[in-house]
């Protein structure tokens, strides 16, 4: 579906999400015919705490009510799917990085280097991470000095679940 069809949907969904104190991460109608799904991804606007399922369920009901009232989705019926980014997410914006401070991130640089590090700070154009090194299995883990990583030097980055 083209972006001009998404605009009325977003215009209905975004104020509902904002009124709930959340950030609209994504709003996309996928599929065709009878198998269409409106996927809405919501998150907390800032902070590092997790978005609870009860809060997602509450905003999902409010979104559903607004969509029924405004009817911005043309064509056949669709299924509404509202979720949060979850424990592992792609880090694409400074806000994503700020939401992940304190957690592990897996980074792949433009040069092809891959590593996992703890995210210590997140700024508008860079992050500060701390890698660790374990020389041999069973030996203590050594924390390396914090290092600056410019977002422009990163090909991909994801938050990681800790063991």
From Swiss-Prot:
**What's in the GO CC field?**
cytosol
Coiled-coil region(s) = none
The main location class comes to: cytoplasm
**Keywords assigned by UniProt, alphabetized:** Cytoplasm, Ribosome biogenesis
- HAMAP family recorded for this chain? RimP
Which family does the record assign?
Belongs to the RimP family.
> Know the name of this protein?
Ribosome maturation factor RimP
Organism per entry: Kocuria rhizophila (strain ATCC 9341 / DSM 348 / NBRC 103217 / DC2201)
Species classification: Bacteria, Bacillati, Actinomycetota, Actinomycetes, Micrococcales
């Amino acid at each position: 579906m083209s972006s001009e069809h998404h605009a009325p949907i977003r215009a209905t969904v975004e104020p509902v999400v904002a009124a709930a104190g959340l950030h609209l991460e994504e709003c996309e109608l996928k599929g065709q015919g009878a198998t269409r799904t409106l996927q809405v991804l919501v998150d907390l606007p800032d902070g590092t705490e997790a978005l609870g399922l009860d809060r997602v369920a509450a905003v999902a009901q409010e979104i559903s009510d607004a969509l029924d009232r405004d009817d911005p989705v043309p064509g056949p019926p669709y299924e509404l799917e509202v979720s949060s980014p979850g424990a592992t997410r792609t880090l694409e914006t400074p806000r994503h990085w700020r939401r992940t401070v304190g957690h592990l991130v897996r980074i792949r640089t433009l040069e092809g280097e891959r590593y996992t590090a703890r995210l210590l700070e997140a700024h508008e154009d860079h992050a500060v991470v701390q890698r660790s090194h374990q020389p041999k299995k069973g030996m203590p883990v050594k924390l390396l000095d914090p290092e600056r990583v410019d977002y422009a030097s990163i090909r991909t980055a994801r938050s990681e679940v800790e063991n």
